[in-house]
Amino acid sequence: MKDILNLVTDVYKKSKLFFIGSMDENDFPNIKVVFPVKERTSLKEIYFSTNTSSKHAVQYRRNPKACVYFLKFIKGRGVLLTGKMEVLETQEIKNHFWNKGDTKYYPKGVTDPDYCILKFTPICGRYYHRYKSVDFKV
């Protein structure tokens, strides 16, 4: 199990794009491509920044069930995680993850009311490599 978590962590730390999934008001899945925050420390908590007004933030408040998918395309490796997503809006958490270039998305800066952080806490996952997959707990 430790080996699989090491492989998954490697994919996590090197992935450029992440796909996050939420459930809409009719319980149909919605997928969105997002960039991760620059600080990636652990698979146990994965953070993204987004607009407070975004459809996904609204959906996560209603139903926190979520999934996250990321991959290393060239190596043929992918990871699907399922768990819970929280919408965080405290100034402390916003300050922690703020980057200078974020004004491109949040023009009012770190105090922009339309800037929030999504915190994903995975429960389990599936690691894909070539034509095989392995289920694991996080």
Regions found by a protein language model. Give the residues of each.
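Short Pro/Gly-enriched beta-strand edge/turn motifs at strand-loop
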Residues: K2, S15-I20, N99-D102
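Short, basic and Ser/Thr-rich N-terminal targeting/leader segments
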Residues: K14-K16, N30-K32, V79, T111-P113
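Charged, amphipathic alpha-helical segments
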Residues: M1-N6, T50-H56, D102-K104
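A short mixed-secondary-structure module that forms the rim of ligand-binding clefts
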Residues: V37-K75
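N-terminal leader/targeting helix
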Residues: F18-F48
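A short, Trp-centered hydrophobic/proline-enriched beta-strand micro-motif
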Residues: D10-E25, A66-F70
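Charged, gly/pro-rich active-site loop segments
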Residues: L80-V138
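Short, surface-exposed beta-edge/turn micro-motifs
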Residues: S15-L17, K44-I46, N63-A66, P113-Y115, ...
